Design a protein with these regions (language model features):
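Conserved SAM/AdoMet-binding glycine-rich loop
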Residues: 114-119, 128, 231-320
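Proteins enriched for Cys/Gly/acidic motifs involved in redox and nucleic-acid/cofactor modification
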Residues: 1-247
Length: 320
């Protein structure tokens, strides 16, 4: 069956504001998926996470969006019509793992009509890697980076309707899109992003270049998400950021990290709070006091010292 869809008109009718724009495209993808199901389209999806806790959180968002679009999650890529990879680029073996996984999907792509293989995450923020994917893996249909994960529905719709490959990688953005669907892996625990990116530029680290400059979320939005998780049965929450200790430094008059941590710990029904990662230069007496006075904050500090040599630390640009 051929579908007559005026893609240009659909885009023109889309709301300009987020997240309304993405929910609009989720509905458009769902309509298309329902039509394809009448022809035997299974509408199964899979997201494979390769990377840190931030990548895992991105994976939950991607799954939530795909389910809202009408897809059903599968753990077997042989059954999947959409396979997405969230990538890491800190370690070289993570890149090699991705190449191997994508290479093994070639035959499935050739056998499964309409299959979409997509890649996102830190690795896709490197231009050379993106160009390598574009040239060596023509069956990879969708590529986007860390700064527009929220746009999955819009980019997926473009790929489905136009039949063309979609590559959209932003160098940076100040935008934080709230209130998107998410599918938690565990019912009893969850993770909440409190900030994105990093301003430290340690000499050995690629994170500021692939995750961008530090952007703190609004404290009210963070607390609202935590409350929703608790209402959904979540007993343990991990607050995530490249450097949680510097939360709020980019927003004049913002809530500090110790203040935010205390507010989260005091939410009724929450048994345990964790956080990661942190930089020793931003560790404060106030944070230690908050941990001391709130017994449900895990007695654990992820504090990567890196070196005991001041000279080496200076060369690392660690600032302590």
């Amino acid at each position: 069956m051929d579908y007559i869809i005026d893609y240009k008109e659909i885009v023109e009718q889309a709301p300009a504001e987020e997240p309304a724009r993405q929910y609009y495209f989720m509905d458009r993808v769902r309509e298309l998926v329902e039509m394809k199901k009448q022809e035997g389209y299974a509408a199964h999806c899979m997201v494979e996470v390769m990377g840190c806790q931030m990548s895992a959180k991105d994976g939950e968002k991607l799954l939530g969006i795909l389910e809202r679009c009408g897809y059903t999650v599968t753990e077997d890529d042989r059954d999947a019509d959409v396979v997405l990879f969230t990538t890491c680029t800190v370690r070289e073996n993570a890149n090699m793992k991705l190449y191997g996984r994508v290479g093994r999907l070639k035959h499935q792509y050739e056998r499964r009509d309409g299959m979409i293989i997509g890649i996102t995450g830190c690795m896709m923020q490197e231009k050379d890697e993106v160009e390598g994917i574009r040239k060596r893996y023509p069956y990879v249909r969708l590529v986007f980076g860390t700064h527009n994960v929220y746009k999955l529905a819009e980019l997926l719709y473009q790929t489905l309707v136009t039949g063309k490959r979609t590559f959209e990688v932003l160098e940076d953005t100040k935008m934080i899109v709230e209130e998107l669907p998410s599918d938690r892996r565990y019912r009893f625990k969850g993770a909440v992003n409190i900030s994105y990116g990093c301003n430290n530029f340690c000499t050995y680290c690629i994170v500021p270049y692939v995750r961008g400059r530090e952007k703190s979320r609004n404290a009210t939005a963070i607390l609202r998400e935590c409350e929703q998780l608790i209402a959904d049965g979540c007993l343990e929450i991990t607050l995530l950021g490249q450097n949680v200790n510097s939360y709020g430094n980019d927003i004049p008059g913002s809530t500090s990290f110790p203040e935010l941590l205390a507010a989260v710990a005091e939410l009724p029904g929450l048994r345990r709070v964790r956080y990661m990662t942190s930089n020793p230069k931003d560790l404060s007496d106030e944070l230690i006091e908050v941990m001391k006075t709130h017994p449900n904050i895990e007695r654990h500090i992820h504090l990567p010292l890196q070196s005991g040599s001041s000279a080496i630390l200076k060369r690392m640009n660690r600032h302590y």
